[in-house]
Amino acid sequence: MAEFPFEISPMFEGERVRKEGMFVELGGPKSLGLELVRAADMDAIEDDKVTIIGPDLKDMEEGKTYPWAMIFNIGGELVEPDLESVVERRVHDFINYCQGIMHLNQRYDVWMRVSKDTAAKMDSFEPFGKAVMMLFKTELPFIEKMQVTFYTDKDEVEKQMETAKEIFKARDARTKDLHDEDVEVFYGCTLCQSFAPTNVCVVSPDRISLCGAINWFDGRAAAKVDPEGPQFEIAKGDLLDAVTGEYTGVNEIAKKLSSGEFDKIKLHSFFDSPHTSCGCFEVVGFYIPEVDGIGWVDREYQGMAPNGIGFSTMAGQTGGGKQIVGFLGIGVNYFYSPKFIQADGGWNRVVWLPSKLKEKIDEAIPADLKDKIATENDASDIESLKAFLQEKNHPVVATWAAAEEEEEEEEEEEEVAVAAAPMMMPAAGFQMPAMPMMSGGSSGGIKLTFKNAKITIDRMIISEKKEKK
């Protein structure tokens, strides 16, 4: 579009600005990044106004990372507070329409980059702000007036961040007393399909969106004001399994929106047909087979989990709209759900959390488990995690003994099977050679133990070993 120094089109959704082509980075894992939309009286809004508090684009150094906050104020006859998070989630859409400007994540995890090519065409964030507001008012006509303030001053960004977190907390609390069984419809969201084409985000009262920005009420408000938009109704259909959270309606939409890639999504399962994971998720869960437990790591944690992998690596192999057994992306508020991974043990299966995340969701953790869940201060690897869980008598420890007994039983069964093998009748014309007995005090015999193995043998030759002279 001629009035802006960069092209604007949905074709730029999914465009990545790589580090080598980046002019500046805004927010992200190395700094603070925030976006917030607030409903306001029409008289309090100066339409299309862009305010910049802190260094503007022309004042920034190439290759540097800066703190970043975007506060949008919207007004209109139909605008109400219930629409704030709905409009807020479309920020991701419309910023990515702008060529050379990459936007990832949401709320207090925003990560943006401006390319060198785009920065060469504009020296201020003002045209960028005006372009985004133009897109909002074009696509969402219930917004009659809009203004935006960009913050790049660290102190100001921190101040806005604290205020915003309280607002987000109040929004999320609205679904506390509403549950999956209380409603007839869930809501779907396809905003992340530009980056994760097969992702099917299902929002229910007991399961917030993976990005953490859309709860059930937000989905309802969005579908009402923008029926053709990215949020829409999903008829629940028949309940197939109350524990896993499997519904016929969800399975149908999963198959349709993933182009047949998946035919089942179980809302509250970690292992069996789990919810797909996009890339905007706030937290990723990972199975730790050595302790039969599940750990969780969020974007803010910069260290390694006990499995020796960091968030970014796990996110890379979990995201993309896939169902990866052993990994699961979620929104932070799902920790507060009474149905939190209930098909696989719920909180009794959680063994590790980063200390800051554990502190953040303290109210969600059952009182009897708070001191039994390790953090990086208690366990940095599998061995130290196992020792911690044993010392605290975590619920997963009880499963270890059962697993060992099962292994012993399997070994005994295998020994019996091997011992019985020579008694089988050989095929006609075949002479089974005599097996040499071991000398000395040994009782002789053969023990073969196969665990989790599938073996196909075309031919087996048993011959006497001749001593070398």
From Swiss-Prot:
Pfam families registered for this protein in UniProt: ACS_CODH_B_C (PF19436), CdhC (PF03598)
A Gene Ontology BP annotation from the UniProt entry: acetyl-CoA metabolic process
Cofactor: record remark: Binds 1 [Ni-Fe-S] cluster.
InterPro entries from the UniProt entry: ACS_CODH_B_C, CO_DH/Ac-CoA_synth_bsu, CO_DH/Ac-CoA_synth_bsu_3_sf, CO_DH/Ac-CoA_synth_bsu_arc, Prismane-like_sf
Biochemical pathway: One-carbon metabolism; methanogenesis from acetate
EC number in record: 2.3.1.169
Keyword annotations: Acyltransferase, Iron, Iron-sulfur, Metal-binding, Methanogenesis, Nickel, Transferase
GO molecular function: acetyltransferase activity; anaerobic carbon-monoxide dehydrogenase activity; CO-methylating acetyl-CoA synthase activity; iron ion binding; iron-sulfur cluster binding; nickel cation binding
Record flagged with keyword Transferase: yes
Residues annotated to bind [Ni-Fe-S] cluster: C189, C192, C278, C280
Catalytic activity: Co(I)-[corrinoid Fe-S protein] + acetyl-CoA + H(+) = methyl-Co(III)-[corrinoid Fe-S protein] + CO + CoA
Family: Belongs to the CdhC family.
Subunit annotation: Monomer. The ACDS complex is made up of alpha, epsilon, beta, gamma and delta chains with a probable stoichiometry of (alpha(2)epsilon(2))(4)-beta(8)-(gamma(1)delta(1))(8) (Potential).
Function according to Swiss-Prot or TrEMBL: Part of a complex that catalyzes the reversible cleavage of acetyl-CoA, allowing growth on acetate as sole source of carbon and energy. The alpha-epsilon complex generates CO from CO(2), while the beta subunit (this protein) combines the CO with CoA and a methyl group to form acetyl-CoA. The methyl group, which is incorporated into acetyl-CoA, is transferred to the beta subunit by a corrinoid iron-sulfur protein (the gamma-delta complex).
Protein name (database record): Acetyl-CoA decarbonylase/synthase complex subunit beta 1
Native source species: Methanosarcina mazei (strain ATCC BAA-159 / DSM 3647 / Goe1 / Go1 / JCM 11833 / OCM 88)
Lineage: Archaea, Methanobacteriati, Methanobacteriota, Stenosarchaea group, Methanomicrobia
